[in-house]
Amino acid sequence: MSRKVSISSLTLSEPMTKPARVQVNPEDIDDLDKTQQVNNHQYNIWYSKSLSDANNKSTTKSKYRVRISTDQGFTKANKNTHICLFFSRGCCYLGSKCQYFHRLPKESDNFKPTQDCFGRDKTANYRDDMDGVGSLNKVNCTLYVGGIHIKPNTEQLLVKNFQEFGTVEKVRVLQGKGCAFVTMKTENQAQFAKEAMQSQSLVEGSNEVLYVRWANEDKNPAAQKQEKKRQQELAYDTVKQLLEQESNKKPRLENGAVNRIETINIDDESEDEGAVEDDEADDDIEETRVNSLSAGVKKNVSTHQANGTPESSSTSDENDHNTILRNSLLKDISRLKKKMVYKREEPYLTNLLVDYSSDEDDD
């Protein structure tokens, strides 16, 4: 039976306005449960299991359970951080000091496609028992829930328990096998619900122990077609939401950008005018010095006098400015003349001495 249930009202106050609650006493947790959040613990490559997975026995009921209404709150996490794995299991002993988020996954979360919402790396294929992080080659929003004690209201109990962690899209109960399939709206919600409902029970105080796994792809063509349509609708809603967010931000950005560009252009024009004048002056000086060193003083003076007439000058200030530059250039040229005469004599004398010494050696 297909049923869509939205997330119920969890708390009257805003959840992120209060610090995250310490879920358990640190002294009550075993050493194996205090392993690091992601990829920093021992890993058995033969069984493809982490050391911390040793306590996750499907036959043992968990002593802890997350209560979103009371446990979630702000922590020391930044915007690029993942959700706390131990918070989803109800056994985080850090509370507001935790470096990860203590909240439900949001549709706006932009986690890496190669990782789950807890920051764990996905694998190419599912494990043989369909447990673990999941596959990076498939977006799976459906969970297999086993170990259920079938009751007349099992479907309602599943919806009640799983809707705390997201939007329940579909629930299908197999009465004769003691299992069910629960489809969440997004994969991140399914990842969180999988960890939160692992080794739990649908009714508080019951002896049942749920084991939650990833569901295999349904072989029914009608179910596959329905799942494909649901994924397309979800992608369409996501794109539509992103476009609406961009359209709301765009007018503000455009107005700010136009004002900024106008001010920058005004400043750039004034700076460019001054830079052009300085560059012209520097070019005149460099050309004068280079030409005077290569071709002689008189030729340079005549060249500057020929180029000294201002091209397309419009104001008297520019003419005065050019005249001052030419006078200063003439002074520099006169100084260079004396140096050039002195420097020309030294190489000449050196060459004579070198020639004389070489002749003596030949004799």
Curated annotation (Swiss-Prot):
Its main location: nucleus. GO terms for biological process: mRNA cis splicing, via spliceosome; positive regulation of cell cycle; positive regulation of RNA splicing; spliceosomal snRNP assembly. The keyword Methyltransferase does not apply. Keywords: Cell cycle, Metal-binding, mRNA processing, mRNA splicing, Nucleus, RNA-binding, Spliceosome, Zinc, Zinc-finger. Residues 265-286 have a biased composition (Acidic residues). GO terms for cellular component: post-mRNA release spliceosomal complex; Prp19 complex; U2-type catalytic step 1 spliceosome; U2-type catalytic step 2 spliceosome. Belongs to the RRM CWC2 family. Associated with the spliceosome. PANTHER family: PRE-MRNA-SPLICING FACTOR CWC2, PRE-MRNA-SPLICING FACTOR RBM22. This is Pre-mRNA-splicing factor CWC2.
